[in-house]
Amino acid sequence: MNFDINYFKETAYKIFNIDSPSGYSENINKVLIELLNELGYTATLTNKGNVALKVVGESSEKTVATSAHVDTLGLMVRSISGDGTLKITRV
């Protein structure tokens, strides 16, 4: 498999620009499933609302699992001080 830097940049830009605050990941999950399916994987949505993907390896002697989060930091700017410092609060 060759690494396509342009595909990587375009895909990263696409997913990084999807709003996905904690508890509201439906939009990013939909896009991730579409992208993974386009790559030939079978991605599904679990009952808990997570994207699941199984990749069969060359050997069944070892099993590897990994996970990642897709939600973004849910903060709101409360005020901006005179020196440019941000005062934030949780959303």
Language model: regions and residue ranges:
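N-terminal hydrophobic/helix-forming segments and targeting peptides
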Residues: M1-V91
